[in-house]
């Protein structure tokens, strides 16, 4: 059994209004991750991903590579995250 970890990421650039959260959700679900993606007031998207470390790294690499074609990612900040609860799915928050 591999250990489950969580990472929080903030994605900056042209990432709102371009289907970014939906694409991130689809990508995360394919990787078996839980967590959420939500738009922040500063125009960035916050992503919390929990699951196998390797799969989280794949999601972060996908985010850094630019995510969906319609988006333009300028920078991605990540740090380890200790959520206050367990996520049972990967959801889109509003």
UniProtKB/Swiss-Prot annotation:
Which PANTHER family is this protein grouped with? ACYLPHOSPHATASE (PTHR47268:SF4)
Q: Which reaction does it catalyse?
A: an acyl phosphate + H2O = a carboxylate + phosphate + H(+)
Superkingdom, natural source: Bacteria
Output this protein's name. Answer: Acylphosphatase
Ordered alphabetically, the record's keywords are:
Hydrolase
Give the InterPro entries listed for this entry. Acylphosphatase (IPR020456), Acylphosphatase-like_dom (IPR001792), Acylphosphatase-like_dom_sf (IPR036046), Acylphosphatase_bac (IPR028627), Acylphosphatase_CS (IPR017968)
User: Domain Acylphosphatase-like: where?
Assistant: 6-94
Active site at which residues? 21, 39
Q: What is its EC number?
A: 3.6.1.7
The family assignment reads: Belongs to the acylphosphatase family.
């Amino acid at each position: 059994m591999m250990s489950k970890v969580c990472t929080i990421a903030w994605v900056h650039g042209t990432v709102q209004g371009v289907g970014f959260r939906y694409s991130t959700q689809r990508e995360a679900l394919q990787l078996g991750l839980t967590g959420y993606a939500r738009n922040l007031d500063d125009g960035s998207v916050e992503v919390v991903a929990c699951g196998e470390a390797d799969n989280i790294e794949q999601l972060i690499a996908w985010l850094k590579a630019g995510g969906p074609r319609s988006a333009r990612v300028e920078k991605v900040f990540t740090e380890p995250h200790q959520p206050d609860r367990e996520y049972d799915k990967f959801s889109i928050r509003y």
